[in-house]
């Protein structure tokens, strides 16, 4: 049977202390979780708060299996990269359109930017108030490969590549590509 309980507090403390010692050397922290308990919420909160205090970019993704998962638990991050299903699970909403859905997720999670993965339909880009014009931006980019042979790891690749773009101060379109 699959165990989905959080890792024990002593191991959480070891992970956090390791990050704490090295945080000044970091430009980016990626949080990626399959919701099996490794990233307990207390640990996630501590890592996010530490990153914010040290001006380290933090980006997150989550793999939701069955009915388990809540991508919004990665609050106040620079970038979230959920699937439509993960976003719907997080805000418990199966009815609203994509723009309403992603804005509700952005408000709940307080994420600065969201790249909503739409599978064969591409990506929905959504960002909160841009500093320059105080507008919310939403756009869609279609798929680059219309006939993929193997999609294993595609979401992980998107998380890593878009997170590195965030570090290089790319705009939202550069980040999405």
Report the location of each language-model feature.
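Residue-level signal for inorganic ion chemistry
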Residues: 29-32, 83
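Glycine/threonine-rich flexible loop motifs
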Residues: 36-42, 90-92
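Conserved N-terminal subdomain of the carbohydrate kinase-like
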Residues: 1-30
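Core Rossmann-like FAD-binding/catalytic domain of the broad FAD-dependent monooxygenase superfamily
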Residues: 22, 87-88
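Conserved phosphate-binding/catalytic region of the ribokinase-like
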Residues: 14, 25, 32, 42-57, ...
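Non-cysteine beta-strand/loop elements that form the S-adenosyl-L-methionine
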Residues: 76-85
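Active-site beta-loop-alpha junctions enriched in small/polar residues
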Residues: 2, 34, 63-65, 85
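Active-site donor-binding loop signature of nucleotide-sugar glycosyltransferases
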Residues: 2, 82, 141-144
């Amino acid at each position: 049977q699959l165990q989905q309980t959080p890792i024990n507090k002593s191991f959480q403390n070891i992970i956090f202390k390791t990050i704490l010692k090295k945080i000044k050397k970091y430009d980016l922290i990626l949080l990626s979780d399959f919701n099996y308990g490794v990233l307990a919420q207390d640990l996630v909160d501590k890592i996010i708060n530490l990153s914010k205090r040290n001006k380290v970019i933090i980006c997150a993704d989550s793999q939701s299996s069955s009915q388990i998962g809540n991508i919004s638990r990665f609050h106040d991050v620079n970038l979230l990269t959920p699937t439509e299903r993960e976003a719907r699970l997080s805000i418990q909403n199966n009815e609203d359109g994509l723009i309403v859905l992603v804005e509700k997720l952005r408000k709940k999670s307080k994420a600065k930017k969201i790249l909503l993965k739409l599978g064969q339909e591409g990506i929905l880009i959504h960002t909160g108030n841009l500093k320059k014009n105080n507008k919310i931006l939403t756009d869609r980019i279609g798929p680059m490969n219309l006939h993929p042979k193997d999609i294993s790891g595609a979401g992980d690749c998107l998380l890593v590549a878009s997170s590195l773009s965030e570090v290089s101060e790319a705009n939202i379109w550069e980040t999405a590509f």
